[in-house]
Curated annotation (Swiss-Prot):
Keywords: Disulfide bond, Electron transport, Membrane, Mitochondrion, Mitochondrion inner membrane, Respiratory chain, Transport. The lineage of its organism: Eukaryota, Metazoa, Ecdysozoa, Nematoda, Chromadorea. This is NADH dehydrogenase [ubiquinone] 1 beta subcomplex subunit 7. Contains two C-X9-C motifs that are predicted to form a helix-coil-helix structure, permitting the formation of intramolecular disulfide bonds. Signal peptide: none annotated. Complex I is composed of 45 different subunits.
Amino acid sequence: MGTKLSVSLEGASTPETAPRVDRPPTFDPQYGFERPRKVREMKATWEEMEQWKLKPAQRDYCAHHLISLMKCQTQNAPFAGHACDGERGAWDKCEYDDHIMRIKEFERERRLLQRQARKEATA
């Protein structure tokens, strides 16, 4: 529950080792991995997202699941709540997995910045 507060306090006390969330990662995404990591790709096109009028916050790697949920809801209205459980579950799981992946990337960046600071301090 206090993650946001602890991250912001850590960023204020040691800004050189706190990752910036408004900028791309400073380290190579493949650094430290034996095999290359799979590059994430958008499955929904910009045209589909425009057609379904997705908000900017909804245009993420899970947009294709949201579009299929919205299609199901329009086809099964007014009983879409029960008919679209599978699509809703797929979208929720994708959003959860995306959130976990972003947290892991943030933690990886933070640890690499701390490691870099330790190396510079000893050199």
